[in-house]
């Protein structure tokens, strides 16, 4: 941290701080100064990390565009297999749902009705349908 500052320079800064600030305010000033330095280091590190992340994303985009321009011909077999799986999954999502069972469904019981009430209603409905003249 103090690469260019020797022991004598640090001692001189300490003595000047003691003379200017006094023994009561010097520790408080040193703590606040170190707090500011820590905050600046954290901010610089976060900016550096964000820039590195953006550069990695840009590099990935460039690699992807380069692969697309080559027609995806020189891809490894594992990567080609995963691309095929993704295409199949996308096609299955885009397909409309198939109706498997076309038989009539019995009405379901509501929470306040018992199964016997539902059976009675369904038998009434079937008897009404069969008794109506056609």
Swiss-Prot record:
Keywords, in A-Z order: Cell inner membrane, Cell membrane, Membrane, Protein transport, Translocation, Transmembrane, Transmembrane helix, Transport
Show the segment(s) annotated as Disordered. Answer: 90-134
Ubl conjugation: present as a keyword of the record?
Answer: no
Protein's cellular compartments? Cell inner membrane
Q: Output the GO biological process annotations, alphabetical, semicolon-separated.
A: protein transport by the Tat complex
Among InterPro entries, the record links this protein to:
TatA/B/E, TatB
Gene Ontology cellular component terms for the protein in this record: TAT protein transport complex
Give membrane topology per the record.
Single-pass membrane protein
Give the transmembrane region(s).
Answer: 2-22
Report biased composition (Polar residues) as residue ranges: 123-134
Cited Pfam families: TatA_B_E
Question: Which GO MF terms are attached to this record?
Answer: protein transmembrane transporter activity
Its biological function? Part of the twin-arginine translocation (Tat) system that transports large folded proteins containing a characteristic twin-arginine motif in their signal peptide across membranes. Together with TatC, TatB is part of a receptor directly interacting with Tat signal peptides. TatB may form an oligomeric binding site that transiently accommodates folded Tat precursor proteins before their translocation.
The record's section on PANTHER family has:
SEC-INDEPENDENT PROTEIN TRANSLOCASE PROTEIN TATA, CHLOROPLASTIC
Q: Which family does it belong to?
A: Belongs to the TatB family.
Give the multimer and partner information. The Tat system comprises two distinct complexes: a TatABC complex, containing multiple copies of TatA, TatB and TatC subunits, and a separate TatA complex, containing only TatA subunits. Substrates initially bind to the TatABC complex, which probably triggers association of the separate TatA complex to form the active translocon.
Protein name according to UniProt: Sec-independent protein translocase protein TatB
């Amino acid at each position: 941290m103090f690469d260019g500052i020797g022991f004598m320079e640090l001692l001189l800064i300490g003595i000047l701080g003691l003379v200017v600030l006094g023994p009561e305010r010097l520790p408080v000033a040193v703590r606040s100064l170190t707090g500011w330095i820590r905050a600046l280091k954290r901010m610089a590190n976060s900016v550096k990390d964000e820039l590195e992340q953006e550069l990695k994303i840009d590099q990935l985009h460039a690699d992807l565009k380069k692969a697309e321009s080559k027609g995806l011909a020189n891809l490894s077999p594992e990567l080609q297999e995963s691309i095929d799986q993704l295409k199949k999954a996308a096609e299955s999502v885009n397909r409309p749902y198939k109706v498997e069972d076309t038989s009539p469904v019995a009405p379901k019981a509501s929470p306040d009705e018992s199964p016997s009430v539902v059976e009675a209603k369904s038998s009434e409905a079937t008897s009404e349908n069969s008794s109506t003249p056609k």
